[in-house]
């Protein structure tokens, strides 16, 4: 059966059409710059790709129409009847959703009630859900939450040292994100280890990034928190800072709470430290060219990532595998080396020659006590698996 996996962002819409249960990609694509008159639509199928530029795509419903039209006009499908399920990535499930769910009107209302916890993401996810439910109305639609995989964290790992009533009244706690990716990659790593019990750390490093400790297939701690801002510096996010920074910036610069939060979310990390770019490729190139602030941005991130890995090593009582995934984790050998070279005291040792090659591979040296792998993530497959599972229930 054909299942469509959808990831709706605030200004983008990613999709992948999969043949299930074979997990074969039939087509994939992306609509970028939604809300503008210069949007772009890309679709890949049968080994070829097509791009349409300078499109007027004022909202997500137009983007959905583009996707459906692209699938039909390129004869990827003969009719919409071939699509037998749609899976939707939803960033924040809060404490309302402990697992993936079949979407109905009540589920949409509950997802919307969590918008305060993910104001940049959940509203866009809902727009995508509503647009696809209207366009393809006669099939199962499933919400798959970034937070679900982390529901196995114990209280001591997900609660903050804030007044307990904040948690009971407002749900103030660590939720974690990228759960779909962490689950997919850790399941593969567990299978490769061939052990009943495993201790795995997954480093999902992209423009957004997080680290997760996984014991026997279950998340027991993760670096992102109430929102994706917690953790280590990424493309534009600061990661952990002293909350008193909000008062300081109000006193020194007259910044409102919203202004400082925006600076921490959109003008920090690689971009804020280097002054060059949010893109790791630009940062690495600038650092290699002698830009000290670009190198500093890489060093600060690597140091904070190592802090998490070392902490989770202790939490897990040792480590069987360290896995790198996502855009930077899979492709930036320089970032992997910066991290692994700081972990030698834990018996984690990189093979530089293996690290210089691309693709799904082991990059640990023969002397390493821990397996180091690069495993490409595939969140769309995980989403499609849940659609198939719930349809067969």
From Swiss-Prot:
Marked site positions, Transition state stabilizer: 178, 237
GO CC terms in record: cytoplasm
Residues bound to ATP: 14, 204-208, 279-281, 327-331
Keywords (A to Z) from UniProt: ATP-binding, Cytoplasm, Kinase, Magnesium, Metal-binding, Nucleotide-binding, Transferase
Pathway given in the UniProt record: Metabolic intermediate biosynthesis; acetyl-CoA biosynthesis; acetyl-CoA from acetate: step 1/2
Reactions mediated catalytically: acetate + ATP = acetyl phosphate + ADP
Binding site for substrate: 89
Subcellular location: Cytoplasm
Assigned EC number: 2.7.2.1
Any single biological process term in GO: acetyl-CoA biosynthetic process
Residues at the active site: 146 (proton donor/acceptor)
Entries under Gene3D superfamilies matching the protein: 3.30.420.40
Pfam families referenced in this protein's UniProt entry, alphabetically: Acetate_kinase (PF00871)
Cystine connections: none
Cofactor: Mg(2+); Mn(2+)
Binding site for Mg(2+): 7, 379
UniProt keyword Ubl conjugation, yes or no: no
InterPro entries, A to Z: Ac/propionate_kinase, Aliphatic_acid_kin_short-chain, Aliphatic_acid_kinase_CS, ATPase_NBD
Cofactor notes: Mg(2+). Can also accept Mn(2+).
GO molecular function ontology, one term from the record: acetate kinase activity
Matches recorded under HAMAP family: Acetate_kinase
Family per record: Belongs to the acetokinase family.
Functional description taken from the UniProt entry: Catalyzes the formation of acetyl phosphate from acetate and ATP. Can also catalyze the reverse reaction.
Subunit description: Homodimer.
Protein name, as recorded: Acetate kinase
Organism of provenance: Acholeplasma laidlawii (strain PG-8A)
């Amino acid at each position: 059966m054909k299942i469509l996996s959808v990831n709706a962002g605030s200004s983008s819409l990613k999709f992948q059409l999969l043949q299930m249960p074979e997990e074969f990609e039939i087509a994939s694509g992306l609509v970028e710059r939604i809300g503008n008159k210069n949007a772009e639509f890309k679709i890949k199928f049968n080994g070829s790709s097509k791009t349409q530029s300078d499109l007027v795509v004022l909202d997500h419903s137009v983007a959905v129409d583009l996707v459906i039209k692209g699938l039909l006009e390129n004869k990827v499908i003969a009719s919409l009847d071939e699509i037998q399920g749609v899976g939707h990535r939803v960033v924040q499930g809060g404490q309302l959703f402990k697992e993936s769910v079949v979407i109905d009107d009540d589920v949409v209302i509950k997802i919307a009630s969590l918008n305060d916890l993910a104001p940049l993401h959940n509203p866009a996810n809902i727009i995508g859900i509503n647009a696809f439910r209207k366009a393809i109305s006669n099939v199962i639609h499933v919400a798959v939450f970034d937070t679900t995989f982390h529901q196995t964290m114990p209280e001591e790992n997900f609660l903050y040292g804030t007044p307990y009533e904040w948690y009971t009244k407002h749900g103030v706690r660590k939720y974690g994100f990228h759960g779909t990716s962490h689950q997919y990659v850790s399941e593969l790593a567990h299978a490769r280890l061939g052990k009943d019990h495993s201790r795995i750390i997954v480093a999902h490093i992209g423009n957004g990034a997080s680290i997760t400790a996984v014991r026997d297939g279950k998340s027991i701690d993760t670096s992102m928190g109430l929102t994706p801002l917690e953790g280590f510096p990424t493309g534009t996010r600061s990661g952990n800072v002293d909350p008193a920074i909000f008062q300081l910036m109000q006193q020194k610069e007259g910044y409102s709470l919203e202004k400082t939060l925006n600076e921490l979310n959109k003008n920090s990390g690689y971009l804020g430290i280097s002054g060059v770019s949010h893109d790791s490729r630009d940062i690495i190139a600038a650092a290699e060219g002698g830009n000290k602030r670009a190198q500093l941005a890489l060093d600060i991130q690597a140091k904070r990532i190592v802090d998490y890995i070392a902490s989770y090593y202790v939490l897990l009582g040792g480590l069987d595998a360290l896995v790198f995934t996502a855009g930077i984790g899979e492709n930036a050998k320089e970032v992997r080396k910066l991290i692994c070279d700081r972990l030698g005291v834990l018996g984690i040792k990189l093979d530089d020659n293996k690290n210089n090659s691309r693709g799904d591979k082991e990059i640990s040296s023969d002397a390493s006590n821990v397996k180091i792998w690069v495993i490409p993530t595939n969140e769309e497959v995980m989403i499609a698996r849940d659609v198939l599972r719930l349809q067969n229930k």
